[in-house]
A protein has these predicted regions:
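Non-catalytic signal-transmission and effector/linker regions of two-component phosphorelay proteins
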Residues: 1-9, 15, 22, 37, ...
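Active-site residues of response regulator receiver
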Residues: 56, 84
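Acidic catalytic/metal-coordinating carboxylates
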Residues: 36-37, 63-66
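C-terminal output helix
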Residues: 88-90, 104, 108-117, 167
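Acidic, metal-coordinating helix/loop segments flanking the phosphotransfer/catalytic sites
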Residues: 34-52
Length: 209
């Protein structure tokens, strides 16, 4: 892994299991944070580092499946690996349909869990990279002036500078100036690249996007 050390969160109400998992995770070069309940885990602020969650299904109060449902919307960058000593088919199906990365039944082989953790962390890193790219794109778009946004909106539909000028009531030379600044701010190397950016930002505004 490059950059930040991956964090593996563990939620299990069994003290011995938490201690064993913490040692195992640390032996793989990851940072481990353990919690005895879902409520303890939910009190922990979200991290912006590659991470995954090793989660016991049967927990007191808020169980593992309910926790999965609670964090599904705002922690898509944190894959979940379920572990349990007693699993039934409906439980496994529900967990996997909701996006679980893996479902392991205790006792499980340490290497199997470590492989699942590596895959989950890689997936988390990929999601975080995509989120960072999206934030960067939105920030670049936010830096545009109102006029530059108007020019961009028309350019990505295929209009020529002269047509853009006619619609906005400005000269073709002025359109070229705004277009040049807009392209630089958006870091777009070509019209096709700009169209792709617009499709990501506002899909409905780009024909056939």
């Amino acid at each position: 892994m490059r950059g930040a050390v991956p964090i593996v969160f563990v939620v299990d109400d069994d003290d011995l299991v938490r201690e064993w998992l913490e040692l195992l995770i640390q032996s793989a070069g990851c940072r481990a944070e353990t919690f005895a309940s879902a409520e303890e885990f939910l009190a922990r602020p979200r991290v912006l580092s590659p991470s995954c969650l090793v989660l016991e299904v049967k927990l007191p109060h808020l169980n593992g499946l309910d926790l999965q449902e609670r964090i599904a919307a705002d922690r898509v960058d944190m894959p979940i690996i379920f572990i349990t000593g007693d699993a039934d088919i409906p439980t496994i199906v529900r967990a996997m349909k909701a996006g679980a990365a893996e479902f392991l039944t205790k006792p499980f082989d340490a290497d199997v869990l470590l492989n699942a953790i590596r895959e989950a962390v890689d997936r988390s890193e990929c999601v975080l990279r995509q989120e960072a790219k999206m934030r960067s794109l939105r920030n670049r778009y936010a830096s545009l002036t109102a006029r530059e946004r108007e020019v961009m909106d028309l350019v990505v539909t295929g209009e020529l500078n002269k047509q853009v000028g006619g619609e906005l009531g400005i000269s073709e030379i002025t359109v070229k100036a705004h277009r040049g600044k807009m392209m630089r701010k958006m870091q777009a190397g070509s019209l096709i690249e700009l169209v792709n950016m617009a499709a990501i930002l506002r899909p409905a505004s780009v024909p056939n996007a």
